[in-house]
Amino acid sequence: MSGERLAIAAVAAAACSWRAPADWSVLAFSDRQLALKSQDDRRPPAAVVNDLLRLRGRGTTDLDGALRSSARQLERSRAKRRVTILLSDCRATAGVDPQAAARRLDELWVIAPEDDADDAAEFARRAGARFATVGGAFDIPAALAAVL
């Protein structure tokens, strides 16, 4: 992940922190998952965004692992709605089929790049998830407003 997709993720993380200042998580994933801000961590949003902006995409994508990590984070949430927002093209290249993990989540929203959304749209349809596309970071507020 780099460039515009990284900017999209940074804006999304900042928006989530603003919307639910005490009850949010940010996970980055490839073949493993990294909690940039776990559910019970009180990190400043700016530190989370800075860490996100330092990431560089690499390797394979374990979507199942990412969704299971999200479920573990949300187990600690006090929110009435436990929403997973997945920013991804949804091409799982490692791990097992992520559909079962996706269907176990309370509420899943898939937000995909509008120029690379076909696999994500199909994944969302099969998982029973809501779906949106974004053309850039400026589209994130409207996409998140629809979600939250």
Segments the model singles out, each with a brief description of its role:
Residues 1-42, 44-87, 91-94, 111-121:
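Von Willebrand factor
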Residues 18-21, 76, 103-106:
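Arginine/glycine-rich "motif VI" loop of SF2 helicases in the C-terminal RecA-like domain
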Residues 90-135, 142:
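VWA/integrin I-like adhesion module and closely mimicked acidic/polar interface patches used
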Residues 141-148:
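A conserved amphipathic helix/loop scaffold
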